Amino acid sequence: MAKQREKVEFRYYEIPEGEVVLALLGEDWIREYGKHIKYLHFHNLLEIGYCHWGTGEVVLGQEHIPFSGHSFMIVPPRLPHTTNSDPGTRGYWEWIYIDLDRFVSEIKHYDPLVLKNMLKRIKRTGYLLSKEENPVLAKLILGIMEESRNKKPYYKDSILGILGVCVVEFLRLSDDEERVMRSRANTTMIAGALDYVSFHYMEEIKISSLAHACNISESHFRRVFEEGMNMKPVDYINLIRIQNACELLKKTEKNMEEVASASGFASISAFNRNFKKVLNISPYQWKKSAENYESKLLYCRISAQKGWE
């Protein structure tokens, strides 16, 4: 199938204050998915979607995988993806978003290096599974959704407990990925580079270092990265830096110079220029914008055209 998307969109989501997850539930999410949307997107949070009914395809990186009722997908923060209903039909999906880094970091009985490796494994790829082939994980996901929907006493404690079991199941998927996942050669090949950016975005990053992290040549790395991520490596680095800047602007009292430095920009002018280039708004305007605080779903668009300079 010919590649149909030449743009990728970054969607910044925020978990409501005091909640464990962001849950998007109910009949508002019955729709024709993918209608009028011609690009992939990725998130700052782990996304889990459960399809109650409907048919179509999920795009995970370069893979087009059919879905039907009782399919569910697990998408790590940096994987470009989208959901498309069959033309002229609607589907009923419900969604939960999890700050996996925060949740795993609060697990007390593991060494920090072990926790870091757990996150790395869980974030390595995405999955589209069915309730039939993985009933345990399907039940856990539906359990989180029902707790979020009903909000009975102690529901947050219940969700935290279920999430702990989900992390175990995610790790088991990673252990057994050859059996349960479709092949995603390009995104798997560049996983080392994605990890490198996650840990070093605040530093100067050379493309040669990313290629080295994947054990391939720089020219081969550039080609594989663009095929897998629909953008150039430098675009991805900037998106991750801006994602971090959004987090700092939203959740800390750091000034703009501190945010720029902590996010990997060499100067405040470079930070302002790149922030406005991809968000079409200045960092100061973004921080003060009321729309960033009022919506249940904090939704910001960062579009990186392939070949964007």
Give residue ranges: language-model regions.
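Amphipathic alpha-helical recognition patches that constitute DNA-binding helices
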Residues: 47, 154, 158, 232, ...
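A short, Lys/Arg-enriched amphipathic alpha-helix from helix-turn-helix/homeodomain DNA-binding modules
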Residues: 134-138, 160-163, 179-205, 209-214, ...
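Structural motif
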Residues: 72, 91-93, 200
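Hydrophobic/aromatic-rich alpha-helical bundle segments in the mid-to-C-terminal region
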Residues: 152-155, 177-182
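Generic protein-terminus/edge-of-domain signal
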Residues: 1-72, 79, 87, 112-114, ...
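Basic/polar phosphate-binding segments, predominantly the helix-turn-helix DNA-binding elements
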Residues: 169-174, 196-242, 254, 258-289
